[in-house]
Regions:
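Terminal, non-catalytic protein-protein interaction segments that mediate quaternary/complex assembly
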Residues: 1-297
Length: 297
């Protein structure tokens, strides 16, 4: 297994780009597109708050990052909203104008036959049993296994678990598993979302376990790859420093409720964006950035 471990994502991302580009396990061509690929990768982030990066050549675009986060945590799956911020989604959308990889819709809106969302199931599992091994959220579901699917969901699942360290301090750890991830485009937006999920779960659980601390974030990927069209840009990027960045929630405000539905603040933020009301402001800098970077002319 290829393992990269560090306190901050900026260093992890630098090392991942370096290994995938200069020391790939394979050079292959799925769908006729040449890639350099690492397989069976573990990324171990010790500080889930240090979940982004800055680089002189390329950094995550706030005009995409924050609208996508708003879309996810609102539980939506409509192409109409997200396509304003990236035309990529137009290529993989369903005929009815929905998107399979709308992670928030999969976790916070869709309910199972027992009336529970994926997030609600994970939270309730840990509320019932602090040592539970059942706090899992499924992204890729059986309904996605159909021929001709242009958007076969890349993330398989996420799992939370609470464990004590040797000093008896309890931590909430999170693990995600993916079948495939684009190192150039996908991961820089996926990691902030996953770690915000961990932060939100931590906030909800602290109502029941007040001394609970946030723990590690581990990310397992079967294929981390770089497409040939991005090779030159990766070379350029690796010539500059990677500085730590953070996309974190304010613990005084929830993004979602315990059942996965959007919080009051997030609902008001979405309304502000849809109505182009840029004068709405909250005490949460993250929600304010969602509004600022989502409102378009």
């Amino acid at each position: 297994m290829n393992t990269i471990k560090h306190q901050n994502f900026s260093t992890i991302y630098h090392d991942l780009l370096t290994e995938a580009y200069y020391m790939p396990d394979y050079v292959s061509a799925p769908r006729g597109l040449t890639i350099r690929e690492l397989t069976n990768v573990e990324l171990h982030l010790l500080n889930p708050y240090s979940n982004s990066f800055k680089n002189a050549v390329r950094s995550p675009k706030p005009t995409y990052l924050y609208p996508e986060l708003l879309w996810y945590f609102s539980g939506r799956n409509d192409l109409e909203f997200i396509s304003h911020y990236s035309k990529f989604w137009n290529r993989i959308a369903n005929d009815d104008g929905t998107v399979n990889s709308a992670y928030g819709n999969l976790l916070f809106t869709e309910k199972n036959e027992y009336g529970l969302t994926e997030y609600q199931w994970a939270l309730e599992s840990l509320k019932k049993d602090k040592d539970s091994r059942q706090a899992i959220m499924r992204f890729n579901k059986p309904k996605h296994s159909y021929l001709g699917n242009k958007d076969f969901v890349c993330t398989l699942n996420a799992t939370f678990h609470i464990r004590k360290n040797r000093e008896g301090i309890e931590y909430l750890h999170m693990t995600t598993t993916m079948r495939s991830q684009d190192v150039w485009f996908g991961i820089i937006y996926d990691i902030p979302f996953y770690t915000l999920l961990q932060q939100q779960m931590h906030k909800h659980l602290r109502k029941y376990y007040p001394d609970l601390l946030i723990g590690d974030f581990r990310h397992y990927v079967l294929s981390e790859h770089i497409y040939e069209k991005d090779f030159k840009a990766v070379e350029d990027m690796l010539g500059y420093d990677f500085e730590p960045g953070s996309v974190s929630m304010n613990y005084s405000t929830d993004l979602i409720n315990e059942d996965g539905s959007p919080s009051r603040e997030l609902t008001l933020a979405l309304d502000a964006v849809l109505n182009k009301n840029e004068y709405v402001e909250f005490n949460d800098p993250l929600i304010n950035k969602m509004i600022e970077f989502s409102i378009r002319d």
